[in-house]
């Protein structure tokens, strides 16, 4: 079973998925990104579009910017999972609402029982005066600029958000617990 931490890890992997919906039982992964960091420096990146079995809805195409044409020649999820599993093996996982991503990966047979840090949970603990804790709103709050709803850019923003949250005075109290 995965274990939540609030301590910023020295070595970690930031993950993000783009999917066709919110249910791992009914929806499919259409993009995966894993950015591996050592001592705060990115040392490895996997970004992969994934071809779903069903067409991507117009809503999801507009939301993610990922079209059916973009994934037409992409590998199926079964072809991508070995590299993703290897990238996550033994890592502390960082993500924004990372349980969402881990549940999709678990539904595909990727098991994870290490530590994870969720910037969504961390932001809710530290920014009680902020009403919305979605990644794009928190990035606006901290002045972090990038495109949204693509897996690799969301990983980069999540990584920066983690450090911005850790720089808050309230974080020192939380991490000491």
Regions inferred by a protein language model and the residue ranges of each:
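Short, contiguous clusters of charged residues that form electrostatic/catalytic patches at enzyme active sites
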Residues: 79-82, 156, 160
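Short, acidic/small-residue loops that bind anionic groups at enzyme active sites
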Residues: 113-123
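Conserved non-catalytic scaffold segment of RNase H-like nuclease domains
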Residues: 1-115, 128-149
